[in-house]
Amino acid sequence: MGQTLLDALNVRVVGSGERVLVLAHGFGTDQSAWNRILPFFLRDYRVVLYDLVCAGSVNPDFFDFRRYTTLDPYVDDLLHILDALGIDCCAYVGHSVSAMIGILASIRRPELFSKLILIGASPRFLNDEDYHGGFEQGEIEKVFSAMEANYEAWVNGFAPLAVGADVPAAVREFSRTLFNMRPDITLFVSRTVFNSDMRGVLGLVKVPCHIFQTARDHSVPASVATYLKNHLGGKNTVHWLNIEGHLPHLSAPTLLAQELRRALSHR
């Protein structure tokens, strides 16, 4: 990249606390998804925010279709950011695909992470004989076809489903960041995410994990949270949130912030 990775991915460090908290956004959003969560943590933490390279807030020229074919290059980006900032230990909050990025990063560099908080995490979206991920292959292919055929129509249908709760402002916000993404990048990343299978590495995670599972998440059924609890290698806790949908930081930020503070203070 012509400019540094920190500039390219819009890395920011805000807050005045001694402890470091990383907030990593998920698919279809950017770091602005944390805006209503952020005020709850600025006094007690130095908060690191950044955009995934696929986010609409990042220059699409930085997205290398030959490189970002798995989640590993996203892990490289995260670890590069932490090293460049001189961070030797942090608590990490990852939503959606960033939950899995955090899991992979903690396997590579466990000393960097005091705990992982995983929101809407899924190691695999496709169903198997002994695993309910929530989607059949045919359903996923229909999603890809809909994205290719008419991106605007797909966003207008997908955003309310993902938000789940009847919170029009959250639907508008998620739609905005989806529309900011270049459609070919959205489709490419969707294929990467939906076709990934991280179940085999879960046992390698030794960092304590807090699994946040909302009610009626269109993308991640409750059984996935139970699967994570049973297969992650370290100490872990499931937090069943009385919030609907896949994006609680948009639809119920105050409630989520309270749950995050509780998990962060848990020893």
Curated annotation (Swiss-Prot):
Q: Which SUPFAM superfamilies match?
A: alpha/beta-Hydrolases (SSF53474)
Q: What is its EC number?
A: 3.1.-.-
* GO aspect biological process, one term: strigolactone biosynthetic process
Q: Which InterPro entries match?
A: AB_hydrolase_1 (IPR000073), AB_hydrolase_fold (IPR029058)
Q: Which UniProt keywords apply?
A: Hydrolase
| Mutagenesis or variant effect for residue 96 to A | Loss of activity and abolish interaction with MAX2A
UniProt note: phenotype after gene disruption: Increased shoot branching.
Any one Gene Ontology molecular-function term assigned to this protein's record? hydrolase activity, acting on ester bonds
Q: Does the keyword Lyase apply?
A: no
Q: Does the keyword Endoplasmic reticulum apply?
A: no
Q: Which residues form the active site?
A: 96, 217, 246
Q: Which domain of life is it from?
A: Eukaryota
What the record says about family reads: Belongs to the AB hydrolase superfamily.
Q: What does this protein do?
A: Involved in strigolactone signaling pathway. May function downstream of strigolactone synthesis, as a component of hormone signaling or as an enzyme that participates in the conversion of strigolactones to the bioactive form. Can hydrolyze the synthetic strigolactone analog GR24 in vitro.
Quaternary structure?
Answer: Interacts with MAX2A in a strigolactone-dependent manner.
Which protein are we looking at? Probable strigolactone esterase DAD2
Give the organism the record lists.
Answer: Petunia hybrida
**Lineage, top ranks:** Eukaryota, Viridiplantae, Streptophyta, Embryophyta, Tracheophyta
